[in-house]
Amino acid sequence: MVYLAILLALAHTVGRSAAGAVDSFDYIIVGAGTSGLVVANRLSEDPSVTVAVIEPGTDQRDNINVTSTTAFGNSFGTAIDWAYSTTKQHEAGNKELPLHAGKAWGGTSTINGMTYIRGNVAEFDAWERLGNPGWNWAALLPYFKKSERYHIPTESQLAAGATFESRYHGFDGPLHVGYIPALENGSYAPLVIDTWEGLSVAHNPDLNSGSVRGFGMGPQTLDTGSNVRWDAARAYYHPVEQRSNLRILKGTVKRITWAKGKGKKGTLVANGVEVLNEKGKSTTLAAKTEVVVSAGALRTPLVLEASGIGNPRILKSLGVETQISLPGVGENLVEQPSHFLSFSANLPIAWSAYHAYVTASDIFGANTSAVEAETRANIPRYARAAAEASGAGSVNARAVEKLLQVQHELIFKHNATVAEILISIYGGGFSNYWTLFPFSRGSVHLKSLDHINEPMVDPRIFLADFDLFTLTAAGKFTKRFWFSEPMKTQASVTGPVGLPHNATDEQWHANLRDTVSANSHPIGTAAMMARDLGGVVDKELKVYGTANVRVVDASVIPMQVSGHLTAALYGVAERAADIIKGAAH
């Protein structure tokens, strides 16, 4: 009876009584975030399959800070933001930096900036080189389209700067993508166009074409008719919440449980999960087919480590018996350092943002060849620094070196964009810029079994000085935008605070170290890569050494992309659902 009472306390489903709760499901999905709800929707299309999603957050469909298309940032620090902090960042003023992640049905798609931009072709193609045959742009494009319901811009939105090429978009998917109705004033567009083109940054007619270099107005995940944010819950769960075979259960997964017998080739077989309710009481739910971990890049490693999967040295310190030695768990964390310039502008409200994606040659100019050579020469040093920072047995420096070499080729051979500059006009506003491909590598690990909601996150911001140099160059290039005609007659730049107008590189470096922020775009902590490179999951997204545990979230993305993670995640999750369904037949 006690067991049943705990289980019933965990259950929460819309329109159904908790009395109908069951303790056994074909699939258990850990996390009702951006990726988890995509997988849940697609798996439950088969009425003979039962799917449970375990999520500590709640339904936020009526939260104005979520539904509003102009309330970005209002949810930060509230009950639906995990509001993590990094460890002290030794190369960034020894400060702890905030990291935002959604704690709600829909995960971070409920609190992010809604930007829908995928990335460059070469970046997705690089995944194949890391031990993932079949993972490339061509394979993912159909899934991007499958998820998308693109809204063609109105004539006034086109006049205000919205552009698109229909062949790159889907029009029948569950995820609404478009431009906010408030984007109706076109007087801002010519200023941006003329200024960027004066700096040799061309207009990009569609930032979702697989080539993001240039500038353009990025679409967002919203319904243009109702002017409402279209997060993963609204797109993938609300329309199907009455399915009798799909349930969201409130609780926090502490660990995966294992069957006594082994699977093929001696693999571990998951038979369920241990779940904690809000009072810390636990129960075990049974999984008959698979466990899919979709807790996000900062939480998925914690679930794996608590389950005995990870670096034996770390597991021993936690008092956890090693089930599978996978030192890559929690490593390869890649987070983007970010900064901003504030300004006042004599401009009408535009209520949208222009994204400029710039290459190394754009921001380094005549020094690009020297930067390329210096960066290539520094790769072994960057790799050793990452290995030493993680401690013995966590990271193989040679493996990190290979990853950084692939990244170097993307930037300097394939002309991948190295920085994003975001120009937002809200009467006044800000210009935000960040390094897209940091060479720094960090980690996230479980603090203790008693603190499963408090990850130790160490992105090691600026561990590789390339990241600092690139952010400096991006900041200086952003200032050039505001001080170039015709924009300079319309705006007055007021930042960075404490930095003189003609600041030296050294002054920029000092300022950035003291004022940098984390972009809350973490990836890579359960990377889809060859095991000898530090990979955690294979090309089928299955955790190495397990028979039936997969990971589907940002932690599997092995290398940053030039877009915004949400777009990439919808495509990855759609494909993952097909992989899982295919394995069952």
Curated annotation (Swiss-Prot):
CC cofactor note: Binds 1 FAD per subunit.
EC number(s) from the headed UniProt entry: 1.-.-.-
Keyword Ribonucleoprotein: no
Keyword check for Aminoacyl-tRNA synthetase: no
InterPro entries xref list: FAD/NAD-bd_sf, Glucose_Oxidase_domain_2, GMC_OxRdtase, GMC_OxRdtase_N, GMC_OxRtase_C
Coiled coil: none
Pfam families, sorted: GMC_oxred_C, GMC_oxred_N
GO molecular function per UniProt: flavin adenine dinucleotide binding; lipid binding; oxidoreductase activity, acting on CH-OH group of donors
Active site per database record: 521, 564
Alphabetic keyword roster: FAD, Flavoprotein, Lipid-binding, Oxidoreductase
Gene3D superfamilies: FAD/NAD(P)-binding domain, Glucose Oxidase, domain 2, Glucose Oxidase, domain 3
Cofactor or coenzyme needed: FAD
Residues annotated to bind FAD: 104
Superkingdom of the organism of origin: Eukaryota
Family stated for the protein in its record: Belongs to the GMC oxidoreductase family.
Subunit text: Monomer.
Biological function: Glucose oxidase-like protein; part of the gene cluster that mediates the biosynthesis of the enfumafungin-type antibiotic fuscoatroside. Four enzymes are sufficient to produce fuscoatroside: the terpene cyclase-glycosyl transferase fusion protein fsoAthe cytochrome P450 monoxygenases fsoD and fsoE, and the acetyltransferase fsoF; the cytochrome P450 monooxygenase fsoB and the glucose oxidase-like protein fsoC do not seem to play a role in biosynthesis of fuscoatroside. Glucose oxidase; part of the gene cluster that mediates the biosynthesis of the enfumafungin-type antibiotic, fuscoatroside.
Protein name from the UniProt record: Glucose oxidase-like protein fsoC
